A protein has these predicted regions:
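Repeated scaffold domains used in trafficking and secretory/extracellular systems
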Residues: 101-105, 148-153, 189-196, 238-247, ...
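Blade-loop segments of beta-propeller domains
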Residues: 93-97, 132-159
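Asp-box/WD-like beta-propeller blade repeats and closely related beta-sheet repeat scaffolds
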Residues: 167-198, 203-211, 230-235
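Beta-strand-rich domains and repeat architectures in extracellular enzymes and scaffolds
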Residues: 88-120
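Conserved blade-ending motifs and adjacent loop-strand segments that build the rim/top face
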Residues: 278-300, 335-357
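Blade/loop signatures of beta-propeller domains
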Residues: 60-92
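Short beta-strand elements that form the blades of beta-propeller/WD-repeat-like
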Residues: 112-117, 160-166, 199-210, 251-266, ...
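Short coil/turn segments at the loop-to-beta-strand junctions that recur within blades
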Residues: 96, 138-146, 186-192, 233-238, ...
């Protein structure tokens, strides 16, 4: 069993490795078996490294939630236009885009794009509605108001503040012009994602439980006083930071946590101050919880089982990408669990990035967009190979 001191030493390493694993998983080419083999090699490398620092996993007792069936097989090919209705597209400032090797989160608030990404370490960058660079929020460093790596962020719309999470134990607050205000340290809990909604901050441990009593979701007021915590962590588990781009998603008055380990969606409802599992994915051959959260067994058994890759909830739609057998599938369904579109997808599915509003963002480089005919065609004439990141603001079909 890993003791608490050892956990504190390895937590940053786990975050770094799992972030790199997330990037590998989210850029899988999902059609051919040869591409599946590439995915397998990538997953093995990431999970093997993580297995060197982790051990001990155990299943927890959870509520059932409404079933979302992914049991059907299909030979149908799905195109992006069947899943997303693009509302707008902007090309990010070329100089700034060149500094972004990856993008992990996007939001659009009051005419500004907030983009979390970087070369090696994450940084929060702002752009105007046309993609012109405005400013960085905070700097990378160790001084007051600086962060080693921005892991996640949230926009506090009530108090006009920007909260940046430096996992696992610090949140930095800035005003909307990037002026540093204050920071909050968490001594005994490891957090990996943050959201703001209804004047509350919601932080998730992503099943990274150090103590048996740790919870999955913690709710704080505007001054970061703890209000309550919900949903038991999987006991004695060292869970990796979630491989989804945005596992913690604002959904109107609710906040959803997407958990591929337990194959569920957990919903925090601020109006009733409660959280529970609201949905449960059903797969033909699901990976057991104990294998999913233990990196070594995940690497050894990933070929044998089906598992969730990514998901986003947007109003009355749920979009899921998942491995089933030897192939990658997507399934767009209603909240009642009725499938609208599902099958293989013949394009590299970008990360599904849920903003705080009713939008899903896709970040695609110009050359990738032009290379693949399956992407939205109506913007082709406006793009060239030298364009960096293109940000598509979409609704689910």
């Amino acid at each position: 069993m890993i003791n608490k001191q050892k956990v504190n030493k390895i937590v940053n390493l786990i975050g770094f490795l799992s972030l790199n694993l997330q990037r590998k998983i989210q850029n899988i080419k999902v059609m051919k078996r040869s591409n599946i083999k590439v995915m397998k090699r990538s997953l093995i490398v990431g999970t093997y490294l993580l297995s060197l620092v982790c051990s001990c996993a155990s299943e927890g007792t959870l509520d059932n939630g409404k079933p979302l069936s992914l049991m059907e097989d299909s030979k149908n090919m799905v195109e992006m236009a069947q899943l997303f209705a693009p509302l707008s597209m902007v090309a990010l400032d070329e100089k700034q885009s060149d500094k972004l090797k990856w993008i992990s989160k996007i939001d659009y608030v009051n005419g500004r794009y907030y983009v979390l990404g970087g070369l090696e370490r994450g940084k929060l960058i702002t752009f105007d509605s046309k993609g012109k660079f405005l400013m960085d929020i905070g700097d990378i460093g160790h001084a007051s108001g600086e962060y080693v790596q921005a892991s996640d962020f949230a926009i506090d719309k009530a108090n006009n503040r920007i909260a940046i999470l430096e996992a696992p134990n610090k949140v930095l607050l800035y005003d909307m012009n990037g002026k540093f205000l204050f920071e909050k340290y968490f001594k005994k809990i490891s957090f990996w994602n943050i959201a703001w909604n209804n004047n509350e901050y919601i932080l998730s441990t992503n099943n990274f439980g150090i103590q048996e009593k740790d919870k999955l979701l913690y709710v704080y007021d505007e001054n970061f006083n703890l209000k309550n915590s919900y949903v038991d962590n999987l006991p004695y588990t060292i869970g990796m930071s979630n491989v989804l781009a945005t596992p913690l998603q604002v959904d109107g008055n609710d906040v959803n946590y997407i958990d591929p380990v337990t194959k569920g969606i957990y919903t925090y409802k601020s109006k009733v101050a409660d959280a529970q599992r609201t949905y449960k994915w059903l797969l033909p051959n699901p990976m057991p919880d104990k294998d999913y959260v233990h990196y070594k067994t995940f690497a050894e058994n990933q070929y044998r089982y089906d598992f969730i890759l990514d998901a986003v909830v947007d109003e009355n739609r749920i979009l899921t990408s998942y491995k089933r057998g030897d192939y990658m599938f997507v399934n767009l369904m209603t909240r009642s669990g009725m499938s609208k579109t599902f099958g293989h997808i013949d394009v590299s599915l970008p990360k599904l990035i849920k903003g705080s509003g009713r939008y899903v963002f896709l970040a695609i480089r110009g050359r990738e967009y032009l290379k693949d005919k399956a992407y939205f065609t109506k913007y082709k004439k406006d793009i060239n190979n030298n364009d960096g990141y293109l940000i598509f603001k979409c609704k689910l079909k």
